[in-house]
Amino acid sequence: MEWIIQKTVELGVTRIVPVMTKRTVVKLDAKKADAKRKRWNAVSESAAKQSKRSLIPEVAPLMTYKEAVKEAAGYDMVLLPYESADGIRKTRELLASVKPGTDIAVFIGPEGGFEDEEVELARENGAEIVTLGKRILRTETAGLTALSILMFQLED
């Protein structure tokens, strides 16, 4: 998780929200989650300094999947990369319509992926289900791929 935080901060995220899904492998109790969060925020600060960012992205408290979906509904766009999504053309068209300054939430699945019910809940709450291509990517790779695509699309 520390490596993911470091790299996503370098790529420009403004907030990181750890989410407990049905297939999340590491389960943290409240005490452990709080200690981890302090460490993760220190990693975020270090990565922000290294990449010369003026904003230090917050690592939010651990959320349930339902809480995260509800919170994400307040963003301009919510993306959920999913291996069973329609082809790359729809994803390209959607990304081509995104303008700089758009607040985007991106859900990245755990090891083992999202369950179908989780994808459907996100869709029902306004998420765009997209693909990152025909390959199944590891969690770490999927997150960096999604952010790299967005960075390329949105940076001046």
Residue positions per predicted region:
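RNA substrate-binding interface of SAM-dependent RNA methyltransferases
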Residues: M1-L80
